[in-house]
Amino acid sequence: SMFGVISAGQPRTHAGLRKIGFFYLKKFTVGRRPLSLYSYENDVIRPLGEPRVHFALNCSAVSCPTLPNIAFTAQAIEQELDNEARRFINDTRHVRLDTREQVLYLSEIFKFYREDFVPAHSASLTAYVNRYHVTPVPLDYRVRFIAYDWTIAAAPR
């Protein structure tokens, strides 16, 4: 989506992006095939069955994963995706524990793409988080979702 933001200009909100059909109507050529960002994510990337991509993809919103400062390579993709999963899951903007209330707060990314994480790769969202979180989360904690902030992320200054 960064290419699209650069070429179309930076709107202030994702509502603005939707108005211009940014994710659904704007087409980019991928392998000689015109695809929208929505089609590329849902018809090309997600069918690969790799949930860690959700921690590497960035839609330019505040709640998106931080855009990696590396180019992913075929030789190191497994390690790179693990690093992004670990970084996202250990960032309290995306995953938080409330030990007093016994609640695991998760980014809505886990809600939007739940079927990519469970049951294909783990028995529960908590079990998936435990693969990367520095502090093991008890499996009996309730799961709540952190509201997604669709505000366009500002470039660091």
Predicted regions located by residue number:
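Interaction/scaffold regions that mediate signaling and macromolecular assembly across diverse proteins
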Residues: 2-157
